[in-house]
Amino acid sequence: MSSEEGKLFVGGLNFNTDEQALEDHFSSFGPISEVVVVKDRETQRSRGFGFITFTNPEHASDVMRAMNGESLDGRQIRVDHAGKSARGTRGGAFGAHGRGRSYSRGGGDQGYGSGRYDSRPGGYGYGYGRSRDYSGSQGGYDRYSGGNYRDNYDN
């Protein structure tokens, strides 16, 4: 449990900042047990955030006070306890896939209502020439393609 207490979220990283640069920058505050820069699974490029675990939780608190809002590799970084807001944000954004998708789909249907087919560019709509199902599958915001819309941006 003490390693979790000493774990910090570091956000707003320069995409070229790697684990070694993070460790070099933060090691003056105390011994570090782990440094991770989170990378995209497919491209292996940095996602702009990471985690640093200090062996002593007091060192982590010192780092948070001293480094939050400071500049690292030309970017202003955010430093916070990993268990506090970083995990809460991640849980809200990634932990409830079904709820997030439902909200997107519901929001699209409510926002456009049944008239959404009438306002599309390209001369389609009003029920002429294209079936409702075909238009729906091309929209990207309705319930039939909500998963596809999200999946395209998940990559």
Swiss-Prot record:
Tissue spec. comment: Widely expressed in the brain. Highly expressed in the cerebellum and olfactory bulb (at protein level). Expressed in neurons and glial cells.
Subcellular localization: Nucleus; Cytoplasm; Cell projection, Dendrite
Residues bearing PTM Asymmetric dimethylarginine: 105
Subunit structure: Interacts with RPL4. Associates with the 60S ribosomal subunits.
Natural source organism: Rattus norvegicus
InterPro entries in the record: Nucleotide-bd_a/b_plait_sf, RBD_domain_sf, RBM, RBM3/CIRBP_RRM, RRM_dom
Name of the protein: RNA-binding protein 3
PTM per Swiss-Prot/TrEMBL: Arg-105 is dimethylated, probably to asymmetric dimethylarginine.
Residue numbers of Phosphoserine PTMs: 135, 145
Ranges for domain RRM: 6-84
Residue stretches in coiled coil: none
A GO biological process held by the record: regulation of translation
Biased composition, class Gly residues, residue ranges: 105-114
Pfam families according to UniProt: RRM_1
Residues bearing PTM Dimethylated arginine: 105
Residue(s) carrying Phosphotyrosine: 153
CDD domains in the record: RRM_CIRBP_RBM3
